Amino acid sequence: MTQASAKFIVVEGLEGAGKSSAIALIRDFIEKHTGHAPVCTREPGGTPLAERIRDLVKIADPSDPLCDESECLLIYAARAQLVANVIKPALAQGNWVLGDRHNLSSLAYQGGGRGLMPLVEAVSNATLKGFKPDLTLYLDLDPKLGLQRAAKRGELDRIEQQAIDFFERARATYLKLASEDECIVVIDASQTMAEVHKDILAVLQAMAW
């Protein structure tokens, strides 16, 4: 791998799937093989404006509940800012980018979970214009197990408090989209952390960059 062949890699998964530890592993792998740390992003978030939008999406306001359509549009507003002001400039400068979630999350959560796929696809096409990661690692986990893990971290946010069937629909959408796109690799996140990390490293080492 070289800095000149900079790529955009994303880690996806339901709550409690182990994204944080996977991202740390991939970050170290990229730095070791390129000599440079990747630009790390999270969604929603990653720019000052996008972080403010993140708070609107994540924190419930009983006095003004966020409707599903507003949630979708806010997330895409944050993503548009991040892509325009961070991700594309970083790639243009030869820097690898490592993302904690990207467009696949919206397709799964808002498209599958909320049942808003036509809106999600329309806004995705309008804002991203075909821009997508070079590789997405989807950490697949039963939603019940994932939420149990997430609950151990502390208080659940507005998204994490959704009913289990929301996450089941999101998972089904993740798996369907992964089956249709060779750039999305499914990792069994029900394994031990060591096994998950072994599988991730195998994918990274096998890719012809």
UniProtKB/Swiss-Prot annotation:
Keywords tagged on the record: ATP-binding, Kinase, Nucleotide biosynthesis, Nucleotide-binding, Transferase
Catalytic activity from the UniProt record: dTMP + ATP = dTDP + ADP
Known EC number: 2.7.4.9
GO biological process: dTDP biosynthetic process; dTTP biosynthetic process; dUDP biosynthetic process
Molecular function as annotated in GO: ATP binding; dTMP kinase activity
Family, as annotated: Belongs to the thymidylate kinase family.
Biological role: Phosphorylation of dTMP to form dTDP in both de novo and salvage pathways of dTTP synthesis.
NCBIfam families documented for this protein: DTMP_kinase
Protein's recorded name: Thymidylate kinase
UniProt organism field: Shewanella oneidensis (strain ATCC 700550 / JCM 31522 / CIP 106686 / LMG 19005 / NCIMB 14063 / MR-1)
Lineage: Bacteria, Pseudomonadati, Pseudomonadota, Gammaproteobacteria, Alteromonadales
Name of encoding gene: tmk
